[in-house]
Amino acid sequence: MRLHDLKPAEGARRERKRVGRGIGSGHGKTSGRGQKGQKARSGGGVRPGFEGGQMPLTRRLPKRGFTNIFKKEYAIVNVGTLEERFEDGAVITPEALIESGIIKDVKDGVKILGDGDLNKKFTVRAHKFSQSAIEKIQAVGGKAEVI
C-alpha cells in the first residue's frame, strides 16, 4: 500500500446534495422545500420553542424561586481523598489542595466533608468543616483549623 492508494472507508464521505439543477435530478425547481410558505423562503423558519402562535411551554409554566446573590459556593473535599493523596503528618491548606490537583480553585472557600476513612494524622486548614469531618480528623490525633 502506498500513499496514493489510500481511500476513505466505504460510506465515510457523502457527496454534496446539489439542488435546483433541473427536474431530472429529483431536486430541481423547489429544491426539496415544497411549495410556498415560511419554510420555503430564504432565511425562513421559526425560532426554537415557537409553537405556531400557541402559548409556548416555557411561558405556560409558572416561574419559581429566585437566585440568592449572597450564596457562597465552597470547593468540597472529603477526608477520604485527603487520606489517599497526602502523607502522614502533612499540613493541608487550600494551596496544597490546588497543587495536588484535588481542587481547581478555592471559589468562596474550601469545605472539608467527612466521607471516607481517615487513618493518617493531618493538620487541616480550611474555611469550613462538617461535624463528621472534625470528629474523624480529631479521632486520629489531627487538627482541624478554621482559617
UniProtKB/Swiss-Prot annotation:
Region (Disordered): 1-58
Gene3D superfamilies: 3.100.10.10
GO-annotated molecular function: rRNA binding; structural constituent of ribosome
Cystine residue pairs: none
Pfam families per record: Ribosomal_L27A (PF00828)
Compositionally biased spans, kind Basic and acidic residues: 1-13
Biological processes per GO annotation: translation
Cellular component terms (Gene Ontology): cytosolic large ribosomal subunit
Source domain of life: Bacteria
Keyword field: Ribonucleoprotein, Ribosomal protein, RNA-binding, rRNA-binding
Biased composition (Gly residues): 21-35, 42-52
UniProt-listed InterPro entries: Ribosomal_uL15, Ribosomal_uL15/eL18, Ribosomal_uL15/eL18_sf, Ribosomal_uL15_bac-type, Ribosomal_uL15_CS
Family the entry assigns: Belongs to the universal ribosomal protein uL15 family.
Purpose of the protein: Binds to the 23S rRNA.
HAMAP family per the UniProt record, alphabetical: Ribosomal_uL15 (MF_01341)
Xref: NCBIfam families: rplO_bact
Quaternary structure note: Part of the 50S ribosomal subunit.
Name the record gives this protein: Large ribosomal subunit protein uL15
Organism this protein belongs to: Thermoanaerobacter pseudethanolicus (strain ATCC 33223 / 39E) (Clostridium thermohydrosulfuricum)
Gene name for this UniProt entry: rplO
